[in-house]
C-alpha cells in the first residue's frame, strides 16, 4: 500500500500505565521532547506521546514495521534506561481499541474522567508542532476523541464525580465532614493541577485557601483568579494547614506531620507519613466506583467494538478520497502538458483552420492514451478490475452524466 494511504496495521502503541508499572515507577517511563526528536530520525513514520499522571504512552504510525525493533532498542539507549522491557506493545486494531478505551475513560485511574479528551487533543497538537506527526496519527486521535465523546453521551460512564482531582477533593470533603468552607487548605503547586484543584475547591465552597509555589508570581496569578491567598513555597508554613494538596516535582522526600490530611498527587510521591493519601490510594477509591458502573462499562465496550468497525470504514473513505485526488491530479498534469504542447503548435499554424483542428484532435487522443493506457493494461491482467470497469461503463452507457451526479460520485 502506498504511504499516502492508511493501513490500520501500521498503528503501534507502546503502553505504560499505573496498572502495568505502578504509579510510583511511572514517571521513570516519561519520554522527553528531546528524546522524541532523536527517535523521529530513526523511524519512517509518525510519533505522538500521551503522558498523564496515570499513563505514559507512545503512539506510532510506521511505514516499515521492521524498524520497530530497532526503535525500541534506541528508545532504551536515548532514554538511558531499559524501559522497553516494561512496555505493553499493541499493534494494529489492538492499538486502536486501546486508544478508544483511553479516550472513553475506561482505562483510567478515575473511570469516566473527562480530562483525557483535552489531553489527547493537546498531545496530537504538540507532536504536530514538533514535526513528529502528521495526518495518520491525527486521523486516529481525532477519531478517538469523537468516540470518547460518543461513549459519554450514550452511557453513564461519566455520571457523578469523575477525574482523579475530583476524587481528591471529594476525599478532602469527607475528612472535613463536608465542612470544607471552614477548613484551612494549602495547594502546593500553581501548575495545571494546582489550577484545577483551586477551581474545584472554589466550586465546593472553600474559602480559606492558600496557593504555594516556587515562583510567587505564578502562585499569585492562580490565587487572584479564585479569590485565594498566595505564598512562596515554604514547607514550614505549609505544615500548619489542616488539609494540604501537593502537585509538584521535588527532588527530596518530606514530612508534613501536622495537617489532618495531605493528598499528594505528585509523580513521584514526595510527602511521607501516615496522614498522606497518594494516587495509589485514590486508585482503590476509583476501583470501588468502577464496581457501581459495571453496566455502563459493558455497554461502552460494546459501543467501542462498533466504533472500531466504523473506524475501518472511515479508513476506506480516507483512502478512496486520496486515490481520487491522486488520479485527478495525474489527469490535470497530463491535461496541462498537452494544452501547452497544443498551444505551441497552434501558434505555428494560426491561419490554418484544418491544421488547428488536427492539432486539437491529436492533443485529445494523446490525453486519452496517457490517462487510460495504464488502466487498460491492468484490466487485461485482472478479471475483477475488468468487471469493475464494465460496471462503470454501464453507469455511463448513455454517453453522459450530469454535473450533479459527477459531484455525487466524487463525494462517495
From Swiss-Prot:
Catalytic residues (UniProt): 53
Residues involved in NADP(+) binding: 189-194
UniProt binding sites for substrate: 52-55, 108, 113-115, 119
GO BP annotations listed: protoporphyrinogen IX biosynthetic process from glutamate
Keyword Transcription regulation: no
Keywords assigned: NADP, Oxidoreductase, Porphyrin biosynthesis
Enzyme class at the top of the EC tree: oxidoreductase
InterPro entries listed in its UniProt record: 4pyrrol_synth_GluRdtase, 4pyrrol_synth_GluRdtase_dimer, 4pyrrol_synth_GluRdtase_N, GluRdtase_CS, GluRdtase_dimer_dom_sf, GluRdtase_N_sf, NAD(P)-bd_dom_sf, Shikm_DH/Glu-tRNA_Rdtase
NCBIfam families xrefs: PRK00045.4-2
Biological role stated in the UniProt entry: Catalyzes the NADPH-dependent reduction of glutamyl-tRNA(Glu) to glutamate 1-semialdehyde (GSA).
Similarity field: Belongs to the glutamyl-tRNA reductase family.
HAMAP family: Glu_tRNA_reductase (MF_00087)
Quaternary structure, from the entry: Homodimer.
Additional record remark: During catalysis, the active site Cys acts as a nucleophile attacking the alpha-carbonyl group of tRNA-bound glutamate with the formation of a thioester intermediate between enzyme and glutamate, and the concomitant release of tRNA(Glu). The thioester intermediate is finally reduced by direct hydride transfer from NADPH, to form the product GSA.
The protein, known as: Glutamyl-tRNA reductase
Amino acid at each position: 500500500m502506498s504511504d499516502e494511504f492508511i493501513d490500520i496495521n501500521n498503528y503501534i502503541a507502546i503502553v505504560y500505565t499505573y496498572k502495568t508499572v505502578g504509579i510510583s515507577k511511572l514517571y521513570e517511563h516519561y519520554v522527553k521532547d528531546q528524546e522524541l526528536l532523536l527517535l523521529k530520525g530513526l523511524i519512517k513514520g509518525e510519533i505522538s506521546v500521551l503522558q498523564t499522571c496515570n499513563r505514559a504512552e507512545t503512539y506510532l504510525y510506521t511505514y516499515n514495521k521492521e524498524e520497530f525493533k530497532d526503535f525500541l532498542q534506541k528508545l532504551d539507549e536515548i532514554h538511558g534506561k531499559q524501559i522497553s522491557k516494561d512496555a505493553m506493545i499493541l499493534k494494529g486494531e489492538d492499538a486502536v481499541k486501546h486508544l478508544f478505551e483511553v479516550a472513553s475513560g475506561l482505562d483510567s485511574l478515575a473511570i469516566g474522567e473527562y480530562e483525557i479528551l483535552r489531553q489527547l487533543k493537546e498531545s496530537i497538537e504538540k507532536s504536530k508542532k514538533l514535526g513528529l506527526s502528521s495526518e495518520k496519527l491525527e486521523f486516529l486521535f481525532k477519531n478517538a476523541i469523537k468516540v470518547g465523546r460518543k461513549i459519554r453521551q450514550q452511557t453513564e460512564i461519566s455520571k457523578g464525580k469523575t477525574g482523579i482531582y475530583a476524587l481528591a477533593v471529594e476525599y478532602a470533603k469527607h475528612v472535613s465532614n463536608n465542612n470544607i468552607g471552614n477548613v484551612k487548605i494549602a495547594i502546593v503547586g500553581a501548575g495545571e493541577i494546582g489550577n484545577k484543584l483551586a477551581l474545584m475547591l472554589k466550586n465546593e465552597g472553600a474559602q480559606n485557601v492558600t496557593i504555594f509555589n516556587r515562583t510567587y508570581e505564578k502562585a499569585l496569578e492562580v490565587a487572584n483568579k479564585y479569590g485565594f491567598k498566595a505564598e512562596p513555597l515554604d514547607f514550614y508554613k505549609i505544615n500548619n494547614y489542616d488539609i494540604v494538596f501537593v502537585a509538584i516535582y521535588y527532588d527530596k522526600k518530606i514530612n508534613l506531620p501536622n495537617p489532618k490530611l495531605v493528598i499528594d498527587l505528585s509523580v513521584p510521591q514526595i510527602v511521607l507519613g501516615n496522614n498522606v493519601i497518594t494516587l495509589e490510594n485514590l486508585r482503590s477509591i476509583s476501583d470501588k466506583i468502577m464496581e457501581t458502573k459495571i453496566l455502563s462499562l459493558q455497554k461502552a465496550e460494546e459501543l467501542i467494538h462498533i466504533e472500531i468497525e466504523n473506524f475501518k470504514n472511515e479508513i476506506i473513505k480516507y483512502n478512496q478520497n486520496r486515490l481520487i485526488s491522486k488520479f485527478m491530479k495525474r489527469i490535470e498534469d497530463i491535461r496541462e502538458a498537452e494544452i501547452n504542447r497544443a498551444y505551441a503548435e497552434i501558434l505555428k499554424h494560426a491561419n490554418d483552420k484544418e491544421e488547428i483542428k488536427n492539432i486539437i484532435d491529436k492533443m485529445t487522443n494523446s490525453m486519452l492514451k496517457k490517462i487510460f493506457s495504464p488502466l487498460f493494461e491492468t484490466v487485461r491482467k485482472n478479471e475483477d478490475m475488468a468487471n469493475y470497469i464494465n460496471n462503470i461503463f454501464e453507469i455511463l452507457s448513455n454517453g453522459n452524466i450530469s454535473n450533479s451526479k459527477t459531484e455525487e460520485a466524487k463525494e462517495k
